[in-house]
Regions:
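Membrane-interface aromatic/basic loop that binds lipid-linked glycans or pyrophosphate carriers
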Residues: 115-145
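Residue-level signal for well-ordered alpha-helical scaffold segments within enzymatic catalytic domains
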Residues: 16-17, 35, 81, 85, ...
């Protein structure tokens, strides 16, 4: 697996933008690598290179819940968008229905038990539903720095 937090490019292979700007947070590198493979552009992974990436360390802890909700919303939206882009709407719909139903049911189950989990599953459901309805990925956390 190649992670998108550290990548180097030979820009001669890219006439337009490298990343699809419809993605936010998730599946950007998966989409890029899929497009590279489709164009027979070689991808190299160097197993001898090590680096430290402190994920989620740039934000204040007081925003942790809002950021987690944002992450879950965008994961579901981006997953559907990726599948639609590369395999078609019906395939994406088939792959996402179980996530949509599961998120709805889990959100309902946690309605009285755990507010934080309920909000997470609500975000997953809404992200998936927005993607199915072909709405843009416009959800952002309400954070004032």
């Amino acid at each position: 697996m190649v992670d998108g937090c550290l990548m180097l490019f030979n820009l001669k292979f890219f006439k337009k933008k490298i990343f699809d700007e419809n993605f936010f947070l998730y599946f950007e590198e998966t989409d890029l690598f899929k497009r590279c493979l489709n164009k027979k552009i070689q991808i190299l992974k160097l197993n001898t290179v090590n680096f430290s990436h402190k994920g989620r360390s740039s934000s204040d802890n007081k925003y942790k819940r809002k950021i987690e909700i944002n992450r879950n919303w965008h994961y579901m939206w981006s997953k559907f968008y990726y599948n639609t882009k590369h395999y078609g709407y019906l395939y994406a719909l088939k792959e996402s229905l179980k996530n949509l139903i599961s998120s709805f049911l889990k959100g309902y189950c946690f309605i009285f038990l755990n507010f934080n989990k309920r909000e997470i599953y609500k975000a997953r459901f809404q992200g998936c539903l927005n993607a199915i309805l072909l709405k843009k990925s416009l959800f952002r956390p309400d954070i004032n720095f």
